[in-house]
Regions:
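A surface/extracellular/periplasmic glyco- and lipid-processing/surface-interacting theme
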Residues: 35-40, 46-60, 67-81, 91-345
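Cross-family signature of deubiquitinases and ubiquitin-like deconjugating cysteine proteases
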Residues: 7-9
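Long, intrinsically disordered low-complexity tracts enriched in Pro/Ser with mixed acidic/basic residues
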Residues: 26-29
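Positively charged n-region of N-terminal signal peptides that target proteins for export
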Residues: 1-5
Length: 345
């Protein structure tokens, strides 16, 4: 009897202990951990060529468009939506633009003009579909022999491309982004591509931008006013406005100004190819450059990194301010670039 009582008492304590442990376990499982209480921070997805928060697919394939910059082609359509614009001499003192679009898709782009070999090379750095209306002999050879993806208005005039009746040829060829997609589909070109991102500054790094204060600067491609480009830093907007002569560069459809965050002026060797004033430009050797960011000027070097023209200082890559970038390619930096403050303008 005594043994039975002892055994019963022991079993009772084992049962009570087990119940208590189970309740504590249930209580622990019911209570969320401190890490579960923390709000989950959603990582911001940024566009690879602007560094700004993405509003569309970041794997959208870039398109590169040669845009006319003759005075009769101004104002242009779609320049305000370009992530990057390269400006270079095409014939004589006339420049053209290579506009790279990835983060935004303008409804209308143009006037579209003929291809140049250096623009084709630059477009390859972004694995872009190349858009032009016409081509130089060397650009034609490159596009065809290298089997690059392109749409040329010579073959789509009146279909994918159209003529604006209010302007005269060759300053009146336009294409819509919708027709770019249509043409790409017809030719079996992919419209998606993993795009390697450019290097961008953080907010903290932007506050630490150093250099010489320069709120206005000029890049000249010729002696005439229409080839004199002025960049003016708007301190309220924190961005640059671009002028051709005294005329603000705006979008033809919306009249919105082209606003820029990085102005990169680079000196490259130019050589004439023919009697039309066509040139070849050395995109590969590197050289001197000037970088304008947030009202500051810095003398840098440039390098071609996988087909992209990027700034370097003391061998280290200089990052861009997030936003839109304009790259001026000039034959002689000292001759082309002017600090308006030094001139007293």
């Amino acid at each position: 009897m005594k043994r039975t009582l002892i055994l019963f008492t022991m079993l009772f304590f084992v049962f009570i202990t087990a119940c208590t442990n189970e309740k504590e376990k249930e209580k622990t499982n019911d209570e969320p951990s401190s890490s579960e209480n923390q709000p989950i921070e959603k990582e911001t997805v940024v566009s690879p060529l602007t560094g700004n928060a993405a509003t569309g697919n970041i794997d959208s394939r870039p398109i590169a468009v040669t845009i006319n910059n003759h005075p009769k082609a101004r104002p242009q359509s779609g320049l305000n939506k370009a992530d990057i614009v390269y400006e270079a001499l095409a014939e004589g003192t006339i420049t053209r633009f290579l506009a790279i679009y990835q983060s935004e898709k303008p409804k209308i782009i143009g006037p579209v003009r003929s291809a140049r070999e250096y623009f084709v090379d630059l477009s390859k750095g972004y694995e872009a579909i190349y858009i032009s209306h016409g081509w130089s002999p060397t650009a034609k050879e490159m596009l065809e022999s290298e089997h690059l993806d392109y749409l040329n208005g010579l073959f789509y005039d009146g279909t994918l491309f159209w003529r604006d009746s209010t302007r005269k040829a060759p300053h009146n060829s336009y294409i819509s982004f919708e027709n770019v997609v249509k043409g790409a589909k017809e030719n079996g070109y992919s419209m998606t591509k993993e795009v390697a991102p450019l290097p961008f500054l953080s907010d903290e790094e932007i506050n630490g931008i150093s250099g010489e204060e320069m709120l206005e600067a000029v890049v000249s491609y010729g002696s005439k006013p229409e080839w004199r480009i002025k960049y003016a830093f708007d301190q309220q907007l924190g961005r640059y406005k671009r002028y051709s002569g005294d005329e603000l560069t705006v979008d033809r459809e919306t009249e919105e100004p082209v606003l820029l965050d990085n102005i990169f002026i680079v000196q490259m060797d130019h050589r004439f190819l023919d009697d039309y004033g066509r040139r070849t430009i050395d995109l590969n050797s590197g050289g001197e450059g000037i970088l304008l960011q947030k009202g500051m000027m810095k003398r840098v070097d440039w390098k071609n990194v996988n087909g992209r023209i990027l700034p370097y200082e003391n061998g280290e890559q200089v990052k861009f301010v997030p936003g839109h970038t304009w790259i001026n390619i000039v034959p002689d930096l000292d001759q082309a670039f002017q600090n308006l403050a030094e001139k007293g303008e």
